[in-house]
A protein has these predicted regions:
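Bacterial Sec-dependent N-terminal signal peptides
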Residues: 3-6, 11-42, 109-133
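Surface-exposed binding patches on compact interaction domains or structured appendages
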Residues: 33, 57-88
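Short, solvent-exposed loop/linker segments at the N-terminal edge
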Residues: 43-48
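Exposed beta-strand face motif in extracellular beta-rich ectodomains
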Residues: 52, 85, 98-102, 300-302
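A short beta-strand micro-motif common to beta-rich folds, especially ectodomain repeats
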Residues: 87-89, 97-110
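Surface-exposed loop/turn motifs at beta-strand-loop junctions within extracellular Ig-like
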Residues: 93, 108-110, 306-308
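Flexible, low-complexity junctional segments that flank or bridge functional domains
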Residues: 126-371, 376-378, 384, 390-394, ...
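C-terminal "post-core" interaction segments
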Residues: 339-342, 350-369, 378-608
Length: 608
């Protein structure tokens, strides 16, 4: 068994290159090891989104790469030798108005030369600068009014001709990064660069939504997406006997969506694989392998081999699934304690029915204590965080303030107008707008039937715990007599939220969510921008990741120990120092999930 070095993935991978094997290891310096390829040296596609499929014969295991993975993404990025090998590439719609190109390389193991070809995509005849300028005008108007730091924004020079390249590269992102007063909107990446929490998402008008009528009648609809059901991955790097990296990697599953190809194949939190389509995972294919598994974009098939003796490849085929963030719930019995355990990965209001079903399961189990696992929850819809907080606290929160809101100075100066726009009341003593807990009616559902009536809550957290997740912690701490204990690592520290605007330009609908308010609990305490400190420090891995609900999983074990008073052998406040295993924070990959993050409030007209 190989020794492994664990690595966390959250943001874009920079500067990683394939390790050269040297001339002595090559079979032929003049050929590529590929014959019978169906691609041409230069391929041209139209501006619309398309998937291009090619076939070829490979003399050995192979790896494919794109130098523009943000819009030209390889779905089958590696494979074994043989004839009729397939290379599937998704090219996203081009709304930039300009022709763009991507270079594709296919490297066969043992061959010095790689096969190469180019894909050129034409610019949109109906999009381009004109369409993007119209889009930017709408974004600009909304930012001038809603953005929390609109004073500086109104004074700066803005380039309305910037193209919408992607959700991470557009007028909104570029302009807000130039500002200086909006420090609470900025987040520092592991490579030292910055991004902003405010976002602009684009969706084709033809994308379907679920027609099933939910019990909760707020109108936030479910949306299917292609996926294997792998909700999160943690990377691992192999090291040799001297604890030095070998150049090979593996991936460990951190969460699996219910009713998905991955869950049906037996994948769970902690499943660890080191081969992808029969080939090792290396620096050369790590980015594309990760991207394919998290966001395949179509019905692709992959083969994954677990890192254990005698493991056989397991085939997974992506299909349209519902990314249900309610990952796990159960009642744990220990002596007189009946402990409710809930793992929740995103405050996605589209799945409020599923969340309420999980809460009802705990209520019917007559729980005496509760552990809420938000370690992977980056936030989402405020209405869902209010709903869950209400269910946890029960009758104690009736008629109490859930959260106070501070908007920009111009909106705070026009109280009546802002009250009409937001649907929130104004507290003249606190000089802030507010929402109450939803005890009673929640969009047609009586939350009194789901009241758990807890007075103490244990929350499992990490640096990925943010926004609406932190709001649950902070707002419950705002209730007199309610105790919240944090176990794990310091949280993210995001105390600001967004109001969502939706509009259409051309063939796309847009969701714009600029940071527009700061949140406070009933005691007018906001979340520390440096993160919420934990009461008990604990790291979630110690040579492996254990599944949710495993009583020896370090963070859960720490919570159970505090509740029952029985110390578990798994409880530890420090990371394992076992030889050959150490954390690495120098490598990072993009967050490609479509789960809502942040602290999101729908304006009354935007609830649909």
């Amino acid at each position: 068994m190989k020794t492994i070095l664990y690595t966390w993935f959250a943001v874009l991978l920079f500067g990683m290159a394939a390790v050269s094997c040297g001339d002595d290891d090559t079979k032929n310096n003049d050929t590529t090891g590929i014959t019978g390829s169906s691609w041409k040296a230069s391929e041209t596609v139209g501006a619309d989104r398309t998937t291009k499929k090619s076939t070829f014969k490979a003399s050995a295991n192979w790896v494919a790469q794109s130098d523009k993975p943000e819009w030209c993404k390889i779905l089958t990025s590696s494979g074994d030798k043989g004839s009729d090998r397939q290379l599937n590439i998704t090219v996203e719609a081009n709304e930039t108005g300009s022709t763009r190109s991507a270079n594709i390389t296919v490297q066969v193991s043992g061959y010095a030369r790689a096969a190469q070809f180019a894909i050129t995509q034409l610019g949109s005849s109906s999009g381009g600068t004109g369409a993007d300028t119209e889009l930017n005008k709408q974004v600009d108007k909304i930012l001038e009014y809603y953005y929390l730091w609109n004073g500086e924004y109104r004074q700066m020079s803005r380039d309305l001709s910037l193209d919408y390249i992607s959700s991470s590269d557009n007028f909104l992102k570029r302009t807000l990064l130039e500002m200086t007063t909006n420090d609470l909107d900025k987040k520092r990446q592991s490579n030292g660069s910055y991004s902003v929490y405010s976002y602009l998402l684009r969706t084709p008008l033809t994308k379907a939504v679920d027609g099933t009528k939910p019990e909760v009648n707020h109108g936030v609809a479910k949306k299917k997406e292609y996926g294997f059901g792998i909700a999160g991955l943690m990377g691992v790097r192999f090291v040799d006997g001297n604890n030095q990296p070998t150049g090979e990697y593996g991936l460990v599953v951190t969460s699996v969506y219910p009713d998905s190809p991955a869950s049906e194949a037996g994948f769970r939190r902690g499943t660890f694989f080191a081969q992808y389509n029969g080939a090792a995972i290396t620096a050369a294919n790590l980015n594309s392998v990760y991207g394919t598994l998290i966001a395949p974009g179509g019905a692709s098939t992959v083969k994954l081999t677990e890192n254990k003796q005698g493991a056989q490849p397991v085939s997974l085929t992506a299909r349209e699934i519902y990314p249900n963030p309610v990952i796990h719930s159960e009642v744990i019995t220990s002596g007189a304690h009946r402990i409710g355990y809930l793992v929740y990965d995103s405050f996605d209001a589209a799945y409020d029915d599923e969340l309420l079903a999980a809460v009802k399961k705990l209520k019917d189990g007559n729980i005496t204590d509760m552990v809420l696992d938000l370690r992977n929850n980056g936030g989402g819809h405020v209405i869902s965080s209010n709903m869950l907080s209400t269910c946890i606290a029960g009758a104690a929160c009736q008629g109490k303030v859930y959260e106070y809101y501070r908007y920009n100075d111009s909106r705070m100066a026009t109280v009546e107008k802002t009250a009409r726009e937001t649907g929130k009341e104004y507290d003249t003593a606190a000089k802030k707008f507010f929402d109450e807990f939803y005890y009673g009616d929640y969009y047609g559902v009586d939350l009194r039937n789901y009241a758990l009536n807890m007075t103490r809550l244990y929350v499992l957290v990490t640096g990925n715990t943010a926004s609406s997740s932190e709001a649950v912690i902070n707002t419950l701490r705002g209730l007199d007599g309610f105790t919240v204990k944090l176990i794990g690592e310091k949280t993210n520290g995001k105390n600001v939220g967004m109001e969502v605007s939706k509009f259409t330009v051309g063939n796309y609908s847009y969701e714009l969510a600029p940071i527009s308010f700061q949140g406070y609990n009933a005691k007018q305490v906001t979340v520390d921008k440096n993160g919420l400190a934990v009461d008990t420090a604990c790291e979630e891995w110690d040579g492996e990741l254990k599944d949710y609900g495993d009583r020896s999983e370090p963070m859960l074990a720490a919570a159970l120990s505090q509740i029952t008073g029985q110390r578990s052998a798994s409880v530890s406040g420090t990371r394992s120092t076992a030889p050959g295993v150490r954390p690495a924070t120098d490598i990072a990959l993009p967050d490609l999930s479509n789960r809502p993050n942040g602290m999101i409030v729908f304006l009354p007209a935007a609830e649909e």
